[in-house]
From Swiss-Prot:
Residues 634-661 are annotated as: Disordered. Keywords: Nonsense-mediated mRNA decay. This is Nonsense-mediated mRNA decay factor SMG8. Residues 639-661 have a biased composition (Low complexity). Involved in nonsense-mediated decay (NMD) of mRNAs containing premature stop codons. Probable component of kinase complex containing nonC and recruited to stalled ribosomes. GO terms for biological process: nuclear-transcribed mRNA catabolic process, nonsense-mediated decay. It holds the Pfam family Smg8_Smg9. Belongs to the SMG8 family.
Length: 962
């Protein structure tokens, strides 16, 4: 023991020189347990008792230190638990995961096992608290301990103790007694007065709070045997260390010891200091206080001397030794309870047995027992203590049920992924009303899985996207002939007279052909109109197919070639791409190759002629050249025609300087001689006058492979589509349109008020006859030609055009400029068609039927009323959408007959090289052409051969683009 007045050792070894001292106590040994919190490095909670471990001591979880002071009947057990900061720090260093909840539950379980052991082997238990107030979490710990003891420990511990030597020493309650619990607060509030009355009042106040909490949660009851622990009656069980500094600064202690050593007692003053002492206010000034002053403070000093934790503990130890330990417990009537004092050997036997059953066997994974209750204790101890886990799990279960119910109650019979995501979001919101905590993430994953399984259980929607981006609403598992999105649009037929309901198309054929064929069967006008026959694929074999990758999609092929040239590896990537996208094709079925030519820019405006006024802003460049944009020159004859057109334009330009002012706004047409070949073509025109080509096509087209998609300027002319996506029809004579009344409802239905007018277009044309012998010229001219000649060669043409837009609700309207809807009235009187003819027109424009600018209408029809004159209007529409410029795909462009009402219906859906071009959700505010536009310069004019009045001209004349 050396300079210490106590002994300390680690359980279970008892030093040989201490064992005889403990044996002398026989059956009067009181076991006092010290447990709780500490902040020092050695996890020491014995500082208030004036005890401390060896300097070489290393704290550890579950370690028990024994303290014994000779001359006392107490054996103090110091329990090192995870409530000690030093032990908790060690566990943190060993922790590998970052799950705080699991770590906290693990630390609490370890502390509960040590506290459970202390309640079974101790008579008195001192709970040490480093804070200044009571920690209410101890109430929760006591509740868990009571649950574990009543539900698990009492089921196996008494039975298993009876099988050992400790069974005869302990009662059926399997412990020495109902232990008395005391509370030691190492720190007193600094703002409280350290007087006897104030300290006692503060201790009593804390006792009342603790007692109320323990009674409220049934930790202590009137029956001592059924209580987890006991509280003394009429005795203090809360102690505040208000005077002693438990862990003083060692440096300050050394300084105080030095001052005490250097202090010397009072001596007689020297005579030379007498004069100085006379200046003192009283005798003994600047000297230590005498014994009289200390005597006056004896009462306070006596209280400080007796107010120690040792004296506080001794009062309860004496109760245990005198046999009145449980008398009057719980502040109720006196009652008898079992209480046993054992010798050190007997206690050691009980301690070993209980420690092994409650703690030791849990740490041994290989331990096997036949006791089912004990087996359940070993297996479920941690789970039974994790009430937070049960609480959070219960909340998550409630939230899960609520979320599943919300999902299933709102789910329709068949729904798609968008609806599923919305329903799942609503289910998650319903879950979050109840479910929360660390297990919420797992519960949400389970909720998503259950909802997904419910959706896939015969409720999944097909969700095949339509060409307008709407999913199919048919069941995915159930067989269905065709897709249907459930969305219905109102659309007009080819001629525009009849409107019908069209389902959302899923194929290009449904969008651009089948619907209009269906409407043509119901429209009285469509069956009567004259249609221009657009070139389509005519198979020569039964197993015809879509064109190969290289022929059908030249743009994709060119991109693949460019990538191959840059990357290493040669042609392997290109060959792989061809195998992936193309079908096998025989050598005999390959399309004929065309020589590469340079394509002209479809967006460029034609050049202006000096013979034509700038106010009309029209070009008189040779239209023959424009007819062959993107195509190779087919014959020397056509080349000569184009050349002659250019020459005539230049000759007319040189002579225009001497012309009069009346010829300033004239369009010059150079007439050519009629040849035998022209006469033959004229004979052909009698057979098919309504669909007359300008120049016969000499290029070979494929009869085994068709073009999958719309024709554009980069697609080969040897491939034709299966069906026409455009429609050009003559709906009647020009007299059916009146500029005073506009388009009537019985003729063109669905037009908005004021937007049902065509715009006038005045064109002045001067015909230039070829030089002939007068007699030959007289023979070649008919009566009508002589009549025109009689009235002069100048013609004033009145053309009416209209660019019609149609929305999905069936509303139709005309545009008077690229950015303005025709409003009628002043717009008709003021505006002409020059703004729409000479400018690019947007493919999409906001419909005025809705206030939202996102509700778009699409350019669907071009209305043309041709004049009654010996000229024909030529159509060459070019729709620029994205990187594609779509055309009619005709090798020869259509010629509109005179004095007739023609309607060109545009495609409903545009598809490029295997790429569907969907309508935009909204237009760009700064550029409404970004989503597509109809290029300017789609109209041309050609002179009609007047030798045959009952025929349309088929001779290759000089053409001029308007």
């Amino acid at each position: 023991m050396s300079y210490k007045n106590y002994y300390t050792w680690k359980y279970p070894d008892i030093p040989e020189h201490v064992a005889p001292l403990l044996l002398e106590l026989q059956n009067s040994l009181v076991i006092v347990g010290i447990i709780g919190r500490s902040k020092c490095a050695q996890a020491n909670k014995m500082s208030a008792f004036g005890m401390q471990p060896d300097k070489t001591h290393e704290p550890a979880d579950g370690q028990i230190l024994c303290y014994y002071k000779p001359g006392t009947n107490m054996l103090l057990l110091h329990f090192e638990t995870t409530h000690d900061e030093a032990v908790l720090g060690q566990q943190l260093l060993k922790q590998t995961s970052v799950d705080f909840d699991s770590f906290y539950e693990q630390m609490r379980s370890r502390f509960l096992r040590m506290l459970l052991l202390a309640l079974h082997v101790c008579h008195i238990l001192v709970y040490v608290e480093t804070a200044q107030t009571f920690d209410t979490t101890l109430v929760t710990i006591c509740q868990l301990l009571k649950y574990v003891r009543e539900k698990h420990v009492l089921d196996f511990l008494p039975q298993m103790l009876r099988e050992t030597a400790a069974g005869s020493l302990l009662s059926d309650r399997a412990r020495l007694c109902t232990p008395r619990v005391l509370f030691l607060f190492e720190n007193y509030p600094q703002d409280e007065e350290k007087s006897r009355e104030r300290i006692s009042a503060y201790e009593f106040q804390t006792e009342d709070k603790i007692y109320e909490l323990l009674r409220q949660y049934n930790i202590v009851t009137n029956n001592a045997n059924n209580s987890l622990f006991a509280l003394p009656n009429n005795k203090q069980f809360v102690f505040y260390n208000a005077h002693e500094k438990l862990r003083p600064d060692q440096l300050l202690l050394a300084i105080e010891a030095l001052n005490a050593t250097m202090y010397k007692s009072d001596s007689k003053e020297e005579e030379e200091d007498t004069e100085i002492l006379e200046l003192a206010p009283f005798e003994g000034f600047v000297k230590p206080y005498g014994a009289g002053y200390e005597a006056r403070e004896s009462d306070e000093q006596l209280y400080r001397k007796k107010h120690t934790v040792w004296h506080f503990l001794q009062r309860h130890v004496q109760d245990a030794l005198q046999g009145c330990f449980d008398e009057g417990s719980f502040k109720q009537l006196p009652q008898s309870a079992q209480f046993q004092l054992l010798g050190v050997n007997d206690w050691h036997i009980c301690m070993d047995t209980i420690h092994r059953l409650l703690i030791g066997n849990i740490q041994e994974v290989s331990y096997v027992t036949n006791n089912q209750n004990y087996k359940a204790y070993l297996r479920d101890f941690n789970e039974s203590l994790n009430y937070e886990k049960k609480f959070w799990g219960h909340l998550c279960d409630l939230g899960l049920k609520k979320g599943i119910s919300a999902y299933k109650s709102s789910a329709p019979a068949i729904y798609g992924s968008v609806t599923h995501r919305q329903l799942l979001a609503d289910a998650i919101l319903a879950f979050e009303e109840e479910g929360r905590g660390p297990y919420a993430e797992l519960a949400l994953a389970k909720l998503s899985e259950i909802c997904l399984r419910h959706w896939h259980d015969g409720r999944q929607q097909c969700e095949q996207l339509s060409l307008r981006g709407n999913p199919c609403t048919q069941p995915k598992d159930a067989p269905h002939d065709k897709h249907s999105s459930g969305i219905v649009h109102i659309s007009s037929c080819n001629c525009g007279r009849t409107q019908g309901r069209r389902e959302d198309p899923f194929t290009l054929r449904q969008a651009n052909y089948d619907y209009y064929e269906h409407m043509a069967a119901m429209c009285n006008l469509c069956v009567k109109v004259k249609k221009f026959q657009l070139p389509v694929f005519t198979p020569s074999i039964s197993d015809y197919r879509a064109a190969a990758f290289e022929a059908a999609f030249p743009l994709l092929l060119q991109a693949a070639k460019n990538r191959t040239e840059i990357a290493t590896g040669g042609d392997s990537d290109l060959e792989a791409a061809g195998e992936l996208y193309s079908q096998p094709i025989n050598a005999t079925e390959q399309a004929p190759q065309k020589p590469q030519i340079t394509l002209s820019n479809g967006c460029s405006q034609p050049a202006l002629s000096a013979t034509y006024g700038s106010d009309l802003n029209m070009s008189i460049a040779g239209f023959g050249a424009s007819l062959n944009e993107g195509e190779e020159v087919r014959s020397p004859e056509i080349s000569s025609q184009i050349a002659s057109s250019g020459l005539s334009s230049r000759s007319n330009s040189t002579s225009s300087g001497t012309s009069s002012a009346n010829t300033a706004n004239e369009l010059v047409l150079q007439l050519k001689e009629r040849t035998d070949q022209n006469a033959a073509n004229a004979a052909v025109s009698e057979i098919c006058p309504e669909a007359l080509p300008i120049v016969a096509s000499t290029e070979q087209v494929s009869t085994t492979e068709y073009l999958p998609g719309l024709v554009h300027m980069s697609s080969g002319c040897e491939l034709l589509p299966l069906f026409p996506s455009w429609s050009l029809a003559c709906v009647g004579p020009s007299s059916i349109y009146s500029h005073n009344t506009g388009l009537q409802e019985h003729f063109q239905s669905g037009f908005l008020s004021g937007a049902n007018f065509l715009l006038p277009w005045d064109v002045h044309v001067r015909l230039v006859q070829p030089h002939k012998h007068p007699q030959q010229q007289q023979q070649s001219m008919g009566k009508k030609s002589q009549r025109y000649r009689k009235h002069g060669d100048r013609l004033a043409l009145k053309i009416f055009v209209g660019f019609e837009y149609e929305c999905s609700r069936g509303h139709r309207f005309m545009m008077c400029s690229p950015d303005r809807v025709l409003r009628g009235g002043a717009d008709i009187e003021r505006d002409t068609s020059s703004k729409v003819v000479n400018n690019n027109m947007p493919l999409y424009f906001p419909c005025p039927c809705r206030a939202q600018p996102t509700y778009l209408a699409q350019l669907m029809r071009i209305h043309v009323v041709t004049p009654k004159a010996p000229v024909n209007i030529i159509l060459d529409p070019k729709m620029c959408v994205g990187k594609y410029t779509f055309t009619l795909g005709c090798p020869t462009l259509p010629r509109l007959s005179q004095s007739a009402y023609w309607i060109l219906r545009l495609p409903y859906v545009y598809q490029g090289d295997n790429v569907l071009i969907t309508p935009p959700e909204r237009l760009e505010p700064d550029d409404n052409m970004a989503s597509g536009c109809l290029l300017a310069g789609m109209f041309g004019i050609a002179e009609t051969d007047t030798n045959e009045t009952n025929q349309q001209a088929i001779t290759p004349l000089t053409f001029t683009r308007l």
